[in-house]
């Protein structure tokens, strides 16, 4: 029984590894055009994640294929991965000091079966400077990330606070993925808390057994 991650993202690989499940990587490699402004962002993320999983499942019959898609939404506008320095600069200026939503959908495919779920995290950006933005662009940070930033970036430190799942903003909610695998009947156990990042132990999506043990230790 093989679990396949349909993503080339090193961040998603690292997050999935936290669950302690052996997996292989087989990226879907599809075009991801952003729909019109009035499209429903949750539906977009779910449809793209499902499509990625379906593409890879078609060439891997019998395997379990996991895919994800992340969209960043600011006042109804979907922000993709910037394609130029100018676009990255404009995105980061737009988000600076403001709240926005990050939606990540996770899809699992095996044969003709599909399981899809998503979660939303609200993110408040800090008041970084124009010089901070320029330095981030010079390092090449924005160009492979929806919205042009990484919440975990130690240099830009773009985020002041968030509400919801932290790993969802990184690109794959660990607990949403864990729950989806369980619902589909894939054999997965609760991760060893010693290997869980602190943000995952305190995540609002974490199972009660994890959050209660964390609270007791405190």
Curated annotation (Swiss-Prot):
GO cellular component: cytoplasm
Alphabetical list of Gene3D superfamilies matching this protein: 3.90.950.10
Pfam family, any one: Maf
GO BP, sorted A to Z: nucleotide metabolic process
Keyword Cytoplasm on entry: yes
Keywords: Cytoplasm, Hydrolase, Nucleotide metabolism
Main location as per UniProt: cytoplasm
GO molecular function terms listed in the Swiss-Prot or TrEMBL record: dTTP diphosphatase activity; UTP diphosphatase activity
Enzyme class, UniProt record, top EC level: hydrolase
Domain of life where this protein originates: Bacteria
Cofactor: a divalent metal cation
Keyword flag Hydrolase: yes
EC number from the UniProt entry: 3.6.1.9
Annotated catalysed reactions: dTTP + H2O = dTMP + diphosphate + H(+); UTP + H2O = UMP + diphosphate + H(+)
Record-stated family: Belongs to the Maf family. YhdE subfamily.
Protein name per its UniProtKB record: dTTP/UTP pyrophosphatase
Source organism of the structure: Thermomicrobium roseum (strain ATCC 27502 / DSM 5159 / P-2)
């Amino acid at each position: 029984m093989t679990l396949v991650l349909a993503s080339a993202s090193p961040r998603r690989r690292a997050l999935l590894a936290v669950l302690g499940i052996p997996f292989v990587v087989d990226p879907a490699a599809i075009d991801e055009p952003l729909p019109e402004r009035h499209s429903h962002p949750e539906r977009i993320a779910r449809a793209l994640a499902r499509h990625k999983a379906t593409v890879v499942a078609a060439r891997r019959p019998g395997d379990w294929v996991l895919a994800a898609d992340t969209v960043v939404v600011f006042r109804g506008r979907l922000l993709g991965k910037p394609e130029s320095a100018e676009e990255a600069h404009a995105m980061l200026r737009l988000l600076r000091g403001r709240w926005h939503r990050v939606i990540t959908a996770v899809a699992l495919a095996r044969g003709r079966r599909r399981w899809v779920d998503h979660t939303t995290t609200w993110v408040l950006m800090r008041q970084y400077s124009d010089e901070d933005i320029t330095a981030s662009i010079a390092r090449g940070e924005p160009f492979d990330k929806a919205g042009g930033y990484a919440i975990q970036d130690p240099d830009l430190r773009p985020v002041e606070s968030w509400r919801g799942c932290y790993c969802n903003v990184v690109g794959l909610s660990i607990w949403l993925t864990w729950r989806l695998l369980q619902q589909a009947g894939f054999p997965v156990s609760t991760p060893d808390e010693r290997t869980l990042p602190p943000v995952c132990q305190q995540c609002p999506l974490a199972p009660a057994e994890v959050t209660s043990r964390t609270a007791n230790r405190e």
